[in-house]
């Protein structure tokens, strides 16, 4: 019962945030410079008649009050009607459907690659604490966090195209962007896995398993893997959302026809309906992914369920008794 209430509460939070994002997008577009009528007519205002201008404004509803315009905007949004592009005259929804798959493919591929690399490296770093393997992994992680993604992308692009003379669309528009985005994400997950595992290795349950004669592999799989990976889920929600925003730079760097590329191209041409659609897509995706991550954490983490059943229990109360000697 407590879980259902908490899930409903998080879903209500998501609806409120989506409403705020939609309203802010409407306000920002109204405050943006330029006149959409000029863009639609593709002519200077001085070269068209007043009747044409007024007819276009009536068609767009620009003569209505801001409150009425906002109401029409929200009503159209609920019906997935984002208007038509000023440039191509195509529905914005259709344009987003054409550009979104490559962005989602790169983002989820980055997520899978990051998990496959970072979880084993985090475990190795924790098991070889303060040895040369741990130090090398920590140095690489620090460098990956410190260097901006676009700088790493430029270096990879230079190495592949100039030094290795490789001309491949799959390499330049898929593999290299995934590697570029994965490096920074891997660094955060490695640090989280390493710190969680170091703490859990000192827990009483691990000491008891060792006293029973269990080998280290059994302890890792049965006692440590789940509590080590569970804290990654909220981080993945945040990281996946930031990946969508990060693709704006990466897609333009590698010339990938995704949402980020579409957004920058629309900003240059002042195609306001498409800009609105891109901003809403990114905002909605981030909110929905984080909500799903919260719900998964709630369903899989016993600590969260215990805290919901008894609010007096603090969320930071460990379910595994940990000794006071913790490794940094």
Curated annotation (Swiss-Prot):
Pfam families (alphabetical): BPD_transp_1, BPD_transp_1_N
Gene3D superfamilies noted in UniProt: MetI-like
Membrane topology: Multi-pass membrane protein
Subcellular location: Cell membrane
Record-level Gene Ontology MF annotations: nickel cation transmembrane transporter activity
GO annotations of cellular component type: plasma membrane
Stretches that traverse the bilayer: 11-31, 104-124, 139-159, 170-190, 229-249, 279-299
Domain named ABC transmembrane type-1: residues: 100-297
Protein's UniProt keywords contain Repressor: no
InterPro entries: BPD_transp_1_N, MetI-like, MetI-like_sf, Opp2B
Keywords for the protein's UniProt record, in alphabetical order: Cell membrane, Ion transport, Membrane, Nickel, Nickel transport, Transmembrane, Transmembrane helix, Transport
Function: Part of the ABC transporter complex NikABCDE (Opp2) involved in nickel import. Probably responsible for the translocation of the substrate across the membrane.
NCBIfam families associated with the record: Opp2B
Assembly with partners or alone: The complex is composed of two ATP-binding proteins (NikD and NikE), two transmembrane proteins (NikB and NikC) and a solute-binding protein (NikA).
Family designation: Belongs to the binding-protein-dependent transport system permease family. OppBC subfamily.
Protein's name in the database: Nickel import system permease protein NikB
Gene transcribed to yield this protein: nikB
């Amino acid at each position: 019962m407590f879980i259902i209430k908490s899930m409903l509460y998080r879903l209500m939070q998501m609806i409120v945030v989506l409403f705020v994002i939609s309203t802010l997008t409407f306000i920002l577009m109204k405050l943006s410079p330029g006149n959409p009528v000029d863009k639609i007519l593709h002519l200077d205002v001085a070269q068209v008649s007043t009747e044409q201008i007024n007819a276009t404004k009536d068609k767009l509803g620009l003569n209505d009050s801001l409150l009425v315009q906002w109401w029409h905007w929200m009503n159209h949004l609920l019906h997935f009607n984002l208007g038509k592009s000023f440039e191509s005259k195509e529905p914005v929804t259709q344009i987003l459907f054409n550009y979104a798959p490559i962005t989602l493919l790169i983002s989820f591929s980055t997520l899978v690659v990051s998990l496959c690399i970072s979880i084993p490296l985090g475990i190795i770093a924790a098991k070889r604490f303060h040895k040369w393997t741990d130090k090398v992994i920590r140095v690489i992680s620090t460098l990956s966090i410190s260097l901006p993604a676009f700088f790493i992308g430029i270096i990879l692009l230079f190495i592949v195209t100039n030094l290795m003379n490789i001309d491949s669309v799959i390499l330049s528009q898929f593999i290299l962007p995934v590697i570029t985005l994965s490096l920074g994400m891997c660094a955060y997950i490695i640090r989280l896995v390493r710190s969680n595992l170091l703490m859990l290795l000192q827990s009483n349950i691990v000491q008891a398993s060792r006293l029973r004669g269990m080998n280290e592999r059994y302890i890792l799989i049965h006692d440590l893997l789940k509590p080590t990976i569970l804290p990654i889920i909220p981080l993945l929600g945040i990281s996946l959302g930031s990946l969508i925003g990060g693709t704006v730079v990466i897609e333009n760097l590698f010339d990938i026809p995704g949402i980020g590329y579409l957004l920058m191209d629309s900003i240059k041409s002042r195609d306001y309906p498409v800009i609105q659609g891109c901003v809403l897509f990114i905002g909605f995706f981030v909110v929905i992914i984080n909500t799903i991550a919260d719900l998964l954490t709630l369903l899989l983490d016993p600590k969260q369920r215990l805290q919901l059943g008894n609010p007096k229990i603090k969320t930071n109360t460990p379910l595994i008794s940990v000794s006071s000697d913790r490794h940094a």
